[in-house]
Curated annotation (Swiss-Prot):
Belongs to the universal ribosomal protein uS8 family. Keywords: Chloroplast, Plastid, Ribonucleoprotein, Ribosomal protein, RNA-binding, rRNA-binding. Part of the 30S ribosomal subunit. InterPro entries: Ribosomal_uS8 (IPR000630), Ribosomal_uS8_CS (IPR047863), Ribosomal_uS8_sf (IPR035987). It comes from Lolium perenne (Perennial ryegrass). It is found in: Plastid, Chloroplast. This is Small ribosomal subunit protein uS8c.
Amino acid sequence: MGKDTIADLLTSIRNADMNKKGTVRVISTNITENIVKILLREGFIESVRKHQERNRYFLVSTLRHQKRKTRKGIYRTRTFLKRISRPGLRIYTNYQGIPKVLGGMGIAILSTSRGIMTDREARLNRIGGEVLCYIW
C-alpha cells in the first residue's frame, strides 16, 4: 500500500491554515516540489526552502495569511484545497474539458506529459492530463 504524498501535502497546508500556523513541513518528492513551486508562483505561499534531516529532505513552506477589511471588521481569508484525482479513482481530462475553478478565480493543478502545470498553462499549451487538485 503506497502513500499519497499529494494528499499529505494538501492536508498539511489545510491544517496549518486553519490553525493559523506560519510554516508547514512536508516530505520532499519531485511531485510535491513541483506543486509547491506552483503555489509559490500563484501567491498561495510566501516562501519555500529545502531542509535536510538524517538523509531525508523536507520542504518548509511559509504560508500567506491574507486579512481583508470590511465594514463589519477584519476577517481572515482561508485557502481551500481539494484533492480530485486519487490513487483509487484517477480523473483525466483533455484540454477542452479542463475545469475552471470558481469561474477562473481558483486554479486546478494538472499532471501532464510536459510536467505539472496549472489549468491556464495547460489550456494555453492545448494539453490535457490528470487533474490533481483544486485550490481557491
